[in-house]
Every structure is written in structure tokens, then in C-alpha cells.
Amino acid sequence: MKITVCMATYNGSRFIKIQIQSILSQLGKKDQLVIVDDCSVDNTVEIIENFKDSRIILIRNTSNIGAVAAFSKSLKAANGDIILLSDQDDEWLDNKVSFVRNFFTINNVDLIVHDAKITQNGNLVSHSLFTEIGSSNGLLKNIYSNSFTGCCMAFKRNILKNVLPIPIKSGIFHDAWIGIISKLYRFKVIFIATPLIIHNRHEDNLSTMKRRSIFKIIPDRINLILALFHRVFNGK
């Protein structure tokens, strides 16, 4: 069972080395780490290239396309049987890949979402991301408020035939899209209350977690629902 890890990077030099080390130490010789760099202006690319590891496939964008499009590009390059998504600034616990590989081997499941420990500026603040965000497997719940956290997701490659291409529209995020599409097409989705990564919150990403205005949320949800409708009924 071949594993592909998909990652999008942008100015991630502060944390990227630790994250890549935590991933590569768990991958087999035939596994791969696909990284799409979205025109970083720091030394992120240099850090990645310094690993000199044949399992790393680095794709450098010539123009900035945004995180969703970058992740979509990494998924198109993935050839593993199981695909794991990764942020650039977390750290994987040392049993993550073996846990995921074994879980897919012995269970009839298409997509899993596992739990995470949370640190903020290096200090442990929570033992459960699930508890923090109120994670749930329900379809309508996730359309309203997303529980599909990309850095905690792994899924079978066959899901991609329904997932790709991911619409590049306001309010549509790659992880929510993958999870909700999987539910709509009746793939088996399981949430597992086992933390397998350390999810790192810091000043560079805390701003993206602020509560948004209802005047922003409503049009974003409409965009998502319309995109889901077009995919399911028109195949677009």
C-alpha cells in the first residue's frame, strides 16, 4: 500500500524542516511526499531541496495561485493508494503513518479524519482538536461548519475521481470539499478520536482562525452549496 503525502507551502521556512523530518522518518522507500510551493519568497524551497530525498517531489509554481489550487495541484501529482494531507507548520507524531496504513488495511473505509493535539507558540493548549472545534461526521453540519481538517485527513485514491477538480471560489476550502464530496458520493467516512499530529498555532496562522462576519459566511456557504450541486448533478 503506497502512501502519498500532499503539502502546499508558502513562506514556511520557520517550521517546514521539522515537519518534513517528521514525515520522511515514517515513509517507506516507495512512498512519496508531493510539495507544491506557491512562490515562497523566503528560503522554504532551499530547505526542501537540502533534504536531497528522492521521495520528495517538489513542484514550484511560477505564479501565486493560492492554497486551494496548490493543494489541488499536489493531488493531481499523487500516485499513492492512500493520500495524506499535510500542513507546512505542524509535526507528525511518530506513529501516524503506521496507524493510517494499518487502519486502511483492516477496515472497510474510504476517508478518515483523526484527532490532533494543539500547541500555541510551542505550548500545549489542548489534547483534542475534535473537542476544540466540535468535530462531527454529519453532512449538513459540515456544510454549515466544517469539521474536515486537512492536516488530519487521509483517504483512498479512488475518491479523487469525484473530488477533482476542486472549484476555486470564495468559501470553498480543499479539505471541506474533499470531505463533503466524499459524504455526498457515499464513501465511507470515519472520524477517529486518536491524535496523530501536533497542530501548531502561531501568530502567522491565528489570524485565519478569527470569527468571520455573518455577511461573509452566508455568501461563502451559497458558493459551496452551488458548487456541490453542479458537481453532483452536472459533473462539473
Give the ranges of each region predicted by the language model:
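Glycine-rich, basic loop-to-helix element that forms the pyrophosphate-binding segment
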Residues: 61-78
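Conserved nucleotide-sugar donor-binding catalytic segment
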Residues: 138-210
